[in-house]
Amino acid sequence: MKAKGYIGLITKGTPARGLAGATLGFFIGFAAVSLFGPTAKSLRGILGLSPLEVGLLVAAPSLSGSLLRIPFSAWVDTTGGRKPFLVLLFLSIAGMAGLFLTLHFYYPERMPRSFFPLILFLGVLCGCGIATFSVGISQVAYWYPKARHGTALGTYAGIGNLAPGIFTLLLPFALVSMGLAGSYLAWLAFLIAGTGLYAVVGRNAWYFQMVAQGVPVEEAKPASAARGQEIFPAGNLIESLLLSARIWKTWALVAVYFTTFGGFIALTAWLPVYWISFYAVTPVVAGTLAGAYSILTSLVRVGGGYLSDRLGGELTGILALCFMLVGALMMTLSGNFRLSVVAGIFLAIGMGVTNAAVFKLVAQEVPEAVGGAAGWVGGLGAFGGFAIPPILGTIVEIRGAGGYASGFVVFVGLAAISLLLVGVLRQKRARVFAAI
């Protein structure tokens, strides 16, 4: 499409194509959440890892995946999402290539314990793809009018969040048929093909395309607005981050999202270890159970958004966190396989619905700095995916095999604290309405 007044200026893409590209890129990158969970048993035996080190192993991808969210989201405001997406995916490819080559040439006979730091580093590199979440959120938001953000962003997050569950389901089968190195080679091929496809399909919104071709900002905005683009870079992300950081409600929501979304990432990585080590199931069964948890959590997030619109974010969050608390208590006290499966369902429902409720609350509780608050919540909240698994591993080290169950007391505590915080938010809001 040619822009008026600029000979040779061509803009490409549509909102639907922008959504498809961003969703594809996020799906490809976010799968790294499940990088080591299904394979931890094999690596633990070869490297001689303690439970704490297993926790660090499965959490490694989430370190970069959470900490890179804020800076790469800010980068979108200057260049559009395409370049940040490709950089993160190429870093993930580099990590996966290194992991495959290490396993291909050294696993299992020539892979002593001294390889553990290298494996962790490669896991952190692979996890860069997890940070594509914030990039895609911004890229999709620029393509769509505000009235369609709910549907567009819900589609983006819902489909992309399915990736870890699907890979957790598939990886154990790949291990049986292709071995450890072969499984990661297949994943590497998927990453390369998917990144290439994103490079073809992914498009920045019209405004960024025009600016990149030399159109002045003051002319690119009205030209893009004429085609339906409503959102433009405000240029005040730093100010928004600083302002939202001074509002206590921002940190309350960070804590809740740390519990539910960070907890979701942590459990997607940890549950295969839990099922194999505590109930002695096969890797295929463990992968199926962990994958089902991850997929269910992602799917109910969509319904959680609907409930939040109908019941309000606070009430939805309180009800969902009660589900999570019950599930965590059941996991902590249960030594029964079937009861633990039911508990996992409670956890999935509670976490998934609360994840949706939190972002309903961001705009409601911090209206003066929504962008900054969303950055803190999304970035630091996801850090739970890195912080929680080592804590679970430490509890196993201290308590032995029984620690796999009693470690869920961490989620009991987090759910209780989050319930208290959402309750305070609800009470404060009720007082405001009463004073009007």
Residue spans for each PLM region:
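Juxtamembrane intracellular "pre-TM" segments in multi-pass secondary transporters
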Residues: 1-13, 209-252
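Extracytoplasmic gate region of multi-pass secondary transporters
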Residues: 36-41, 247-300
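C-terminal ends and interior cores of transmembrane alpha-helices
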Residues: 90-111, 322-335
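Cytoplasmic helix-loop-helix junction between adjacent transmembrane helices
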Residues: 122-159
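Helix-loop-helix hairpin linking two adjacent transmembrane segments in secondary transporters
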Residues: 156-207
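A membrane-interface helix-boundary motif in multi-pass transporters
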Residues: 176-189, 394-414
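C-terminal membrane-cytosol helix-exit motif in multi-pass small-molecule transporters
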Residues: 189-223, 419-426
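C-terminal transmembrane helical hairpin of 12-TM major facilitator-type secondary transporters
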Residues: 308-358
